Amino acid sequence: MKSRLLQRVPLKSTASLAGHPLRLRAVQTRAASSVSQRPNSDYVSFPGALKSAFTSQLKFESPESYNALPTYRVVDQHGTIVDSSFEPDLSEEAIVKLYKDMLFVSVMDLIMFDAQRQGRISFYMVSAGEEAVSVGSSSVLDPEDVIFCQYREQGVFKERGYTTKEFMSQLFANKNDSGKGRNMPIHYGSKRLNVHTISSPLATQLPQASGAAYALKLQRQQDPNSKPRVCVTYFGEGAASEGDFHAAMNIAATRGCPAIFICRNNGYAI
């Protein structure tokens, strides 16, 4: 750490103070202000190592030695509400609609997966077991919010109003497809629903989402009376291993972007 030289400013000339016991002298001090340099501090405190405890033992750390982050749940596997004080602020009609959307996605996945195996379409990916992730998260967003999906978010499209005809037109690449059949199956997109078209390369949607969120922030600054909007992006744990993931997080954090990152950890990655 660099040192700096602090000097007292004399009120009289240095010659007149030559024999004085409080004569001018150079004092060398440390320009340190972090908690780690303060007396009796047990932790390091600077960006990148917040609350990192000091230790005199050098050893390898294993992730298995730490407790995993807790998983929040509302109901158990039997459908029983875990927290009796929890009351959803949704009408019965809204809840039934969410269930129908999840059921639609599940049935469509079964039919279209078989169709792909029969050679009727060239490609398909299911979202079995992940229907609630996409449908539930999409239901709390506003229609004006911007979304970037990966390839298992059929539920997002269905919940926001993507029709059965639009699904089939995209999968079979006919003239009614918004992309005019120029894209692979399951690469849905809808300008009407504010959902960007899905792209094949893994994790490319993440920095794009951060950029879109930054644009929303700038629009809000230019027009403070406009409605606040957020940008949401979905990805899997495999995409979290890509460099684009870290770049996207860095952009969103340093720019203070209104971005929401939803990671699906299903234990599989391409």
Please place each PLM-identified region on the residue numbering.
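N-terminal mitochondrial targeting presequence
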Residues: 1-45
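Thiamine diphosphate
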Residues: 4-5, 260-270
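N-terminal amphipathic, basic-rich helices that act as targeting or association modules
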Residues: 32-151
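Structural beta-strand/beta-sheet cores of well-ordered domains, especially the beta-sheet scaffolds
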Residues: 70, 145, 184, 257-259, ...
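A short, flexible beta-alpha/helix-coil linker loop
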Residues: 80-81, 154, 266-269
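A short alpha-helix capping/helix-coil boundary motif
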Residues: 90-91, 226-229, 261-265
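A short, structure-level motif marking secondary-structure boundaries and short turns
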Residues: 97, 232-234, 267-270
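Cofactor-binding active-site loop characterized by glycine-rich and histidine/acidic residues
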Residues: 107-110, 114-255
